[in-house]
């Protein structure tokens, strides 16, 4: 059983890669995750990443236009690329009670994921 670390936060991401009913791309708004992760890291708080399906998390290509140096620093880190964007945890792999907080990222992709994501509250 995992030891509870009350200084650990679960970051909820999206798996949706296009607007429903269209071919227009969407996904995680990078700043929604990266700015939060940067703040947590600076405070010495660890984060884990989960998405409704686990695995790959697409980025909204429009979000890259607004990425500043702090956002890019997180984006370019090996840890973020692996644990957030490539191999996010699936809901069945986490116990929300193990976390002191759950942070739900914003962006357009989560509009279609939210029904699945809301199950974390149960």
Where are these regions (language model features)?
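Extended, subdomain-level signal for the structured scaffold at the beginning of enzyme domains
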Residues: 1-122
